[in-house]
């Protein structure tokens, strides 16, 4: 783990109990952080993404931000209307509340610091990650997809198909700094290389 990623991840773990309490069963943690902390523990993640169970993402964002601020968390507006930034002495974390169009079909309850907390299921995260890779081709999204498939004992053929359809992943160096296991990253690199060579 290199650069700024380790302190960000540590701060996410520190603040999760407060996040869980403030989410109040109305927000669902999604994305790489949900996958990494609650499902696979395969890499670190450095931001917090939420889907709302209601139809007003702005109100949900403001409620979360206000609750955290009341707990003494330093939360500030972002240049993007659906985000805010939590500042710590050594780093900062982006918090984003996605629009209601991002649906979570099977949220799961988890216990965090004595509070119940909704987290997206691995099936929901897989669906969202496939959409994300098609849109931005980030290596971390494809890495997450590969390890979801691996956790379910499924072959990696879908990885090769996605590379063929959408192109090779970018930001491999950034991903390398996020992955816990060097062997996992090397396995992913081989899959990407083989897919690029065979075109299938």
Feature map (PLM): residue ranges:
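Compositionally biased terminal segments of proteins
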Residues: 1-200
């Amino acid at each position: 783990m290199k650069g700024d990623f380790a302190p960000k991840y540590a701060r996410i773990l520190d603040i999760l109990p407060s996040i869980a309490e403030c989410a109040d069963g109305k927000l669902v943690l999604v994305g790489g952080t949900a996958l990494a902390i609650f499902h696979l523990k395969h890499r670190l993640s450095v931001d917090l993404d939420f889907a709302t169970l209601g139809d007003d993402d702005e109100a949900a964002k403001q409620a979360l931000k206000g609750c955290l601020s009341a707990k003494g968390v330093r939360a500030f507006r972002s240049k993007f209307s659906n985000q805010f930034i939590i500042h710590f002495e050594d780093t900062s974390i982006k918090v984003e509340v996605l629009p209601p169009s991002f649906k979570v079909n099977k949220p799961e309850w988890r216990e965090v610091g004595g509070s119940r907390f909704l987290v997206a299921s691995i099936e929901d995260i897989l669906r969202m990650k496939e959409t994300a890779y098609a849109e931005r081709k980030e290596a971390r999204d494809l890495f997450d997809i590969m390890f979801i498939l691996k956790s379910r004992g499924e072959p990696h053929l879908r990885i090769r198909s996605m590379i063929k359809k959408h192109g090779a992943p970018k930001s491999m160096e950034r991903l390398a700094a996020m992955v816990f296991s060097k062997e996992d990253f090397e396995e992913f690199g081989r899959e990407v290389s083989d897919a690029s060579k065979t075109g299938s």
